[in-house]
């Protein structure tokens, strides 16, 4: 497997575009995105667990109940959530796009992201669709820009992999800076592949993958109302269709995880106001469930995230987060170290502090990517979670989000 360019357009038969249609006030910001497959594709998705769900999720879930999709449309700037006519608007978006592409409206995945509780006017979307469709091409970047809200960085990736003797491609784009806390979904992620795989196996692969990828990110502890991860697989690579578990399915799952884990890191690093990516790596867990609980609890701790912003090696906040994680852990066996490109330093062993240089620790924690290495001493299970530091800018961004 090798990393390639192209994002969601790396796979055969997929094109994309993004335009400004007028939902967002800033005319330099794209606010409407499209991904299109030249043939119908197997489709799968996972959705937010928030009881308050955006209308687009309801429409998408109904549309791809048969496991087929051919296009994805997403607007940014308005979440189309808690609106009396939300379902009607999301359904109309599918119809307008279906008419423009000459495909069935129920072959469309629809998504929205932005402010909750404000009416979404269909007119700018209707006016923008002709340019959106007319500009379809190798424009993964434009589509990525079209789904961004408070994101600072574009998030896209693609890989090439051999499956069943054929060269397959898989790529994805994502948005998500705030409201990142699972369980699924925690952001918008759109993945495309030309691998031939049944919708049932595609759903199985995605549902399993999110447990160790997107469900292991936390930016601010809020679970979004709108977000989802969707995958379209159009089969144009020509491999024998994957319909059951086996070597080809395992290879596909590895490729899918390469995409999702890369996007996870990018999302965590681009947390609202973030200056540092935090990666908590837990080893020696009694089982994976306990290891995940520990890793997730640490990256969710506001006190610890604030300490990382200040480059303060306050390992006590790590143990505190482990203690309330709900994991079955023997604290007297816990070890903690901090690592970055500047080096590594142990700060805790056997559940107690060890002597270390505060100056050396600060050098390590001043880097923009920090690893928190935790050993539990209870077994062989491992887990990784991602987050970011908590900065002044997070409050500034969210204090005036609607303006």
Where are each of the predicted segments found?
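A structural signal for small-residue-enriched, beta-sheet-centric alpha/beta enzyme cores
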Residues: 1-88, 92, 98-403
């Amino acid at each position: 497997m090798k990393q390639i360019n192209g994002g969601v357009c790396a796979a055969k038969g997929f094109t994309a575009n993004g335009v400004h249609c007028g939902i967002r006030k800033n005319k330099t910001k794209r606010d409407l995105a499209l991904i299109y497959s030249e043939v119908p594709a197997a489709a799968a998705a996972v959705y937010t667990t928030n009881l308050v769900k955006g209308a687009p999720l309801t429409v998408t879930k109904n549309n791809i109940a048969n496991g087929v999709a051919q296009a994805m449309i997403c607007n940014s700037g308005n979440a189309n959530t808690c609106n009396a006519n939300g379902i009607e608007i999301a359904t109309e978006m599918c119809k307008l796009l279906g008419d423009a592409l000459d495909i069935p409206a129920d072959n469309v995945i629809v998504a929205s992201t932005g402010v909750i509780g404000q009416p979404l006017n269909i007119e700018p979307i209707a006016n923008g669709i002709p340019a959106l469709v007319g500009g379809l091409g190798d424009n993964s970047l434009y589509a990525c820009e079209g789904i961004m809200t408070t994101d600072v960085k574009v998030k896209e990736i693609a890989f090439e992999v051999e499956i069943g003797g054929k060269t397959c491609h898989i790529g994805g784009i994502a948005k998500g800076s705030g409201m990142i806390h699972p369980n699924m979904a925690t952001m918008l992620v759109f993945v495309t592949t030309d691998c031939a795989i049944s919708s049932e196996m595609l759903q199985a692969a995605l549902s399993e993958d999110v447990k160790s990828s997107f469900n292991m990110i936390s930016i601010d502890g809020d679970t979004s109302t709108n977000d989802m991860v969707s995958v379209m697989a159009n089969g144009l690579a020509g491999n024998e269709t994957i319909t059951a578990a086996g070597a080809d399915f395992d290879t596909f799952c590895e490729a899918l995880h390469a995409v999702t884990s890369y996007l996870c890191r990018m999302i965590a690093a681009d947390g609202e106001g973030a200056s540092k990516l935090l990666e908590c790596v837990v080893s020696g867990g009694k089982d994976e469930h306990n290891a995940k609980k520990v890793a997730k609890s640490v990256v969710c701790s506001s006190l610890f995230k604030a300490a990382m912003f200040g480059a303060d090696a306050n390992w006590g906040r790590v143990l505190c987060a482990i203690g309330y994680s709900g994991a079955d852990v023997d604290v007297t066996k816990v070890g903690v170290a901090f690592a970055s490109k500047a080096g590594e330093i142990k700060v805790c062993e056997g559940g107690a502090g060890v002597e270390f240089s505060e100056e050396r620790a600060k050098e390590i924690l001043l880097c923009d990517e920090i690893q928190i290495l935790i050993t539990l001493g209870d077994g062989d299970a491992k887990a990784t979670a991602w987050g970011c530091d908590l900065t002044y800018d997070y409050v500034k961004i969210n204090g005036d989000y609607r303006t």
